[in-house]
Amino acid sequence: MKQDSRFPNLFILDHPLIQHKLTHMRDKDTSTRTFRELLREITLLMGYEITRNLPITTKRVETPLVEIDAPVIAGKKLAIVPVLRAGVGMSDGLLELIPSARVGHIGVYRANDHRPVEYLVRLPDLEDRIFILCDPMVATGYSAAHAIDVLKRRGVPGERLMFLALVAAPEGVQVFQDAHPDVKLYVASLDSHLDDHAYIVPGLGDAGDRLFGTKN
């Protein structure tokens, strides 16, 4: 895991397996089926990395030989909140890693001015719960920042929120950081820039279209 000095709350997951799978996802000739499988696999690997600092407590258990105080994750079940629609493809990998997690959804689409328009919010109970929000792309950063706003407006503090994405543009990371300096943003790659259509370069195309086999 590495950081970029420009963005204190950005963490780049540079594990070789994550980078290998991301390269195959970038390939324009990768099929929808393979893209979907790779998204699940890479999200599972990234989920392992971002959960390494979850709070721990102990529980009394009886092994076949003795009783011991053994470590377990403290607090309530985690919640996974994909940002629709492409974020849904990431929730499968996280649920494979954390099958007991609760799942919410935030529906946001990008208007012509690239600003987010919210159309759906469904969340589990919020008190004392850690939330992992996910969306493959942080391009302009407005949708990611808006999704965090949704939870903060409902009283969830930044220290109980984290955002997981595959690739991000510096412009979007700056927007996210300015809006939420207290929320950690985890990505597999910080790419070069946004083009004139607000697509990430080099990026991987439209993640939703590639995931679901649709045309923009």
UniProtKB/Swiss-Prot annotation:
Pathway: Pyrimidine metabolism; UMP biosynthesis via salvage pathway; UMP from uracil: step 1/1. Its cofactor is Mg(2+). Keywords: Allosteric enzyme, Glycosyltransferase, GTP-binding, Magnesium, Nucleotide-binding, Transferase. One of its GO terms (biological process) is uracil salvage. Allosterically activated by GTP. Its EC number is 2.4.2.9. 5-phospho-alpha-D-ribose 1-diphosphate binds at R85, R110, D135, P136, M137, V138, A139, T140, G141, Y142, S143, D206. It catalyses: UMP + diphosphate = 5-phospho-alpha-D-ribose 1-diphosphate + uracil. Binds 1 Mg(2+) ion per subunit. The magnesium is bound as Mg-PRPP. Pfam families: UPRTase. It comes from the Bacteria. Uracil binds at I200, G205, D206, A207. Transmembrane segments: none annotated. It is an enzyme of class 2 (transferase). One of its GO terms (molecular function) is magnesium ion binding. Belongs to the UPRTase family. Catalyzes the conversion of uracil and 5-phospho-alpha-D-ribose 1-diphosphate (PRPP) to UMP and diphosphate. NCBIfam families: PRK00129.1, upp. This is Uracil phosphoribosyltransferase.
